[in-house]
Amino acid sequence: MTAPNSTPASSRKRVRRRRQDKPALSAKLVLDAHVKGDVGVIATDLFADLFPHLWANGDSQDTVHVAIAPWAPSQTPEANNWSIVPVIRSSTVAPSTVQFSPSSLALQSFATHLQQAAPSKLSGHNKGGIEILILDVSPIELDTVFVNLDGELAKRLEDGEGTFFREHPVNGKGKARADATPEEHLTAALRTALGTLKIVHSGDFFPLPLPPHPVTHQPPNPGRITLCEPVAQGILAPTTKIIVSRVRTSKTKRSSASGQQQGRKLNGVAEDDEDAYFSAAEEDRDSKTNAQTAETDADDTEFEPQAGEDEDNLSDDSLDEIISLQVPTLPTTVTGQSTIGTGTPTMLRGRKTNGPGSVISSYTATTARPDRPRGRLFKAHGLMKPIPPDLLHPKPTPEDDEEACIYVDMRDLTRVGCFSGDWIRVEAASEPPSNGLGAFGLGSFVEQEADEINWRPARVFGLPEGYSSRSATRSHHSRHDSRNSSFFEAQSQKSNPPAYTSPILLANLDNPPYLRLSPIKRPSSSIIKGVAAQSKTSSTLKPPFAREVILQHVRTPTAVERDVQSAVMAGLKHYFERRLRVLRTGDLIAVPIDTQLGKALQESTIPGEDSAIDEVLGLIAATRPGQSLHYDDVAWFRVGHVQAMKQDTTEAVDGEEAEDLWGGIACVDISLTHLEQSGSVTGRIPGTISNSWQYYLGIRKLPKHQQNPGLPAQLQTLEPEKQYVSSLRRKLRELMAAATSKPALHLNLPPLAILLVSTQRHIGKAATAMQACSDIGLHTFAIDAYDIVNDGGGGGGSDVKTAGFLTSRAERAMSCGPESCVLLVRHIEALTADRMVSSIKEILADARVLIATTTEVEKVPDGIRALFTHELEMSAPDEQEREGILSSILADRGIGLDHGVDLSGIALKTAALVAGDLVDVVDRALVAQRSRLEKLTAKATGSITFRDVQLAGGPAASGLTKQDFELAVDAARKNFADSIGAPKIPNVTWDDVGGLGNVKDAITETIQLPLERPELFAKGMKKRSGILFYGPPGTGKTLLAKAIATEYSLNFFSVKGPELLNMYIGESEANVRRVFQRARDARPCVVFFDELDSVAPKRGNQGDSGGVMDRIVSQLLAELDGMSGGEGGGGGVFVIGATNRPDLLDPALLRPGRFDKMLYLGVSDTHDKQVTIMEALTRKFTLHPTVSLRSVAERLPFTYTGADFYALCSDAMLKAVTRQATLVDTKIRELNAAAGPEGKQISTAYFFDHYATKEDISVMVTEQDFLDAHRELVPSVSAGELEHYEQVRAMFEGAKDKDKKKEGAGGDGNGVDGLESGNRNGMLAITMGDDGAGAESTKKDGKGKGKAADNEVNGAGEGKGKEGVSPFQESGGDEDEGLYD
């Protein structure tokens, strides 16, 4: 809505606020050619109801905006697709009417929604109007509009060919300058063209300001709006960005594309764009072809009885199944058992082409049956939500039972042989054979007993428009439309038409995969009366009323609680009061209840006032259904006995025929029927794996794609998409199904006891067990062991009380049936008393399935643990499991997603998070979405409300976006790091690490490759998951480890040596195990051992009394061996060690499979590398333009480590800050001196608020600051220490280069040159040593002079070397071969 720009100054009336909870109004949309332009006309009464705050202004003709949607029973903004259109009020319009021009561009979006919801309303001009829902709305200014434009037309607009004609303005608005650039020409033309749309909708077409073709006068192809941000529809603002995407249109499509804009009108022409729609009239012409598609085999085919023919003359042989083989020509005699030829005279039963012995038909097993199944075969589908009766025709009465109805497509009613609203026979059927034998399958000639057929009468209705699925592709038309085009097409498996019904009705029919629908069998007296009797029997007659009905309560864990009995009785009373229920003996009745409200009312009322509670609950359910009551459970009842009244009909000859006609069902009228509840029974309920009763009864929310009414053929009718099922849930389901099966009960097999173990909490053990029970229809009675221990109390005899409480609750669970109820004990580690072993044994003696969960399995007593037959471990979910869990959470809550959201990417970012953490991620994403929408409403101009954003629609407004999930994942990962004790990693990236190019490449090969390409390691190749950084202190070993964790989005564990030590025997090794277990739970992650030489020194050299360090090293070796395989839970865990004394490490740590990747981190040996490090450290500094880092680096020695460079840059920045502060203080003193002693003295804060310039605020580091810091800096590592580290490096790397052939360089040289040439790939290492000898000789002292030999260590160059290499280095020397070449 656009409020008036001017308000009279004299008007001091208080502005009325718009209601956000206003329900939508029903109105009619009339297309009137007399209405000109794109703005509609709204009736005065609608204007007064929608805009009461503007109604008081009098005769205001300002344009306002309303949101319209095709009429639907649900009037909430979230459940409909709304289109915002501009209107003005008029007193000449009929009440409750909105008029638009048939060619209005504003109705393009509404036409799309109407086509999906009710296509027939687009097929012709509806003079009575189109029923719509209408709401007031304020449009939002759009930030970005994405436009698709033909490339040639865009080029013409860039050339300035745009002319403004017809609906385009003729003034100069929007025209570009004469000297404008091509981009300005295009921008001006598009902004003018989009200006013709009063409201911009996603998917709208708009005319371009180009002249038509000079010869054909055909207008150019219109532009198309592909996307609007931040909402799907709004107004174009001057600040709106227009992004053009140029597409190429083929010549064959240009003619049709030019008429797309005119096709998207509501004047009787359906839109004809790339999403082609075919109306019912087109499909009627292909009804025979569509009938072929729906056939499965000859068993499922039946023709309608013709005039003068009895229904016994019907045959399953159909003309639709005739095979057309034209070439080569076959004899006219068709294969089959019949010997009657083409010259056979007319048979006794009349001229037929589909009977036995026909010249066209084959002799089949179906025709050989004495009493073949009658009716049409349909695929059974349970409804996700009841179909509103207002959409059905004929409209059912309010008392009709919706659970006794079946819905099929309108075109399938004729094949059943009935009309919409007739009573039919519904028979449970099995799946038809899929092999080539067809009706000749095994057992096809065996006659089935009539008593074995599970059937019942039900009313059939045609699916409302928009619900039925219709093919969107044209069928191939051949010359012989009634014949199959080939033999192989006739033999192919074809789908049956769907039939939708209540999942409760399907459960009472034993959940059959198929239903056979046929007209209800007429009594013998009705056959004489003919068609009139058939019509009367099918539609007019009703089942007999019940005289007495006995109900038995199905015991479930929730329904047996005393606190919810009042809610159960109130729900049962309401169930029979609002409908005439159709029941028969053995039926299940599902009564949804609100247990929370029932318990609250039970606690707040006086004992004995149960009748008042029933009345309150019944009144709430009757007056505000679905708004105040939030159903969270279902009470189940079974019909024990139904006694029907004698039916006074003329059709029935005797009682047996009447009973056979209705199959034992009866209508329950609470005013006539004696309803009695007698006792209770135990048994299973329908399993959710094959029944959708949880969605149908409102216990679970519908998935978002099911709640979208813009989806034809799938609007609350189809079953939900297949959700992710974990392997553990599937295994639990199989074990419980086997333990509770009839053979297991008959053979009295031992009970099933399962212990679910995990190392993390909130991983979903109990939820997985409950879901597995619900899948197969078992009840779950959950017990928390800590609650039992608390109820037992302290003091003497607490164990006896605890055991008593456990036994009593187990007995209550067994009252629901041992074969149909599972006892779930959570946190079983709390039951540590010895008496619990005997108590659990007693429970297992009566129960069939016992499931216990624990996160601390070592605390479970051995006696209790030995009672379990299965022990299953639930580990942290991997990437695919996390994606499945996320999709399940979103589906259960009915949350939609933006098109840009990729759940697999979110699953990758949520590594190490379990199910409970993923629920928290979704909750945080919802909070982020709410905050984003609130910011959008606050940012928008005018009176924009939160409901306006919802009405504007779009995936970003109605669902979660990628930004919402990013905020949620970041917050969840921070909380997860706190929960597992992982340190917070600073935001260290590769940019913060200067140089070390070869080290980065080696790290990428070790870590990134297994993460991004796991298929390379799928054939048994072991991953190299251990990296050892060694070198002088301050060279960036810890910084590099943090950068690895940040760059690859890994969790980071930092382990110090003293953290692992413990005074108790065995605890130090246990600490090592816990570290790696936490790493496996948090994978992918990095375990960083800083100062590894203190954690794992050489074994046998320590003087500790108990050999603690030796045991720690042994445990560390055992854990490292499990990391490289990846199959045993170690995949995704990378171990990084850092030390400056690798010679002190235990040699076993450096063998293959452990720390086999050794990377030396040294100092910079060239000024170029020093400049690279300084650039990384000063990338956030503001350097003076005259600063040259190279000139600074040339004055620095080669002994500076990374830490020294960090200190150098930090000191330089500090000196710059000090210098700038001194200058500011000098200016303040000068100002105070100029003001004099009597003037106002200014402070530092006042100076920065009023006098400071940009130069005073900015701090720029000069080259002199670096030089001053260099003079004061003392290197952290001396030249002698660097020489020692270089010797250590040569000792470790010498074995790797020993067998390589190098071209040595002769001559003498100093140690610096030799080390520089011996360094590999720019490794940051240099030794400022004395002039030394040349290449390594074979002497023991390692010194000598001469040319480098092929087998020498240091390769080309001269320097000091060392001959002795320990055996362990030679064994693992080839692992890093070629790394430093």
Curated annotation (Swiss-Prot):
One Gene Ontology cellular component: cytosol
Annotated spans, Disordered: 1-23, 247-315, 333-374, 467-499, 1294-1381
Q: How does it sit in the membrane?
A: Peripheral membrane protein
Q: Where is the composition biased (Polar residues)?
A: 1-10, 333-345, 355-367, 487-499
Catalysed reaction per UniProt?
ATP + H2O = ADP + phosphate + H(+)
Alphabetically sorted, this entry's keywords are:
ATP-binding, Cytoplasm, Hydrolase, Membrane, Nucleotide-binding, Peroxisome, Peroxisome biogenesis
Which Gene3D superfamilies is this protein grouped with?
Answer: 1.10.8.60, P-loop containing nucleotide triphosphate hydrolases (3.40.50.300)
Basic residues composition bias: which ranges?
11-20
Task: Write out the GO biological process terms.
Answer: protein import into peroxisome matrix; protein unfolding
GO MF assignments: ATP binding; ATP hydrolysis activity
Q: Where in the cell is it found?
A: Cytoplasm, Cytosol; Peroxisome membrane
Annotated ATP binding sites = 1031-1038
Write out the biased-composition intervals (Acidic residues). Answer: 270-284, 296-315, 1372-1381
Compositional bias per record (Basic and acidic residues), positions renumbered to this chain: 1294-1305, 1337-1350
- Enumerate the InterPro entries for this protein: AAA+_ATPase, AAA_ATPase_domain, ATPase_AAA_core, ATPase_AAA_CS, P-loop_NTPase, PEX6_4th_dom, RecA-like_PEX6_r2
Its biological purpose: Component of the PEX1-PEX6 AAA ATPase complex, a protein dislocase complex that mediates the ATP-dependent extraction of the PEX5 receptor from peroxisomal membranes, an essential step for PEX5 recycling. Specifically recognizes PEX5 monoubiquitinated at 'Cys-6', and pulls it out of the peroxisome lumen through the PEX2-PEX10-PEX12 retrotranslocation channel. Extraction by the PEX1-PEX6 AAA ATPase complex is accompanied by unfolding of the TPR repeats and release of bound cargo from PEX5.
Q: How does it assemble?
A: Interacts with PEX1; forming the PEX1-PEX6 AAA ATPase complex, which is composed of a heterohexamer formed by a trimer of PEX1-PEX6 dimers.
Recorded family membership: Belongs to the AAA ATPase family.
The protein depicted here goes by the name Peroxisomal ATPase PEX6
Organism for this UniProt entry: Neurospora crassa (strain ATCC 24698 / 74-OR23-1A / CBS 708.71 / DSM 1257 / FGSC 987)
Instruction: Give the organism's phylogenetic lineage.
Output: Eukaryota, Fungi, Dikarya, Ascomycota, Pezizomycotina
What gene is behind this protein? Answer: pex-6
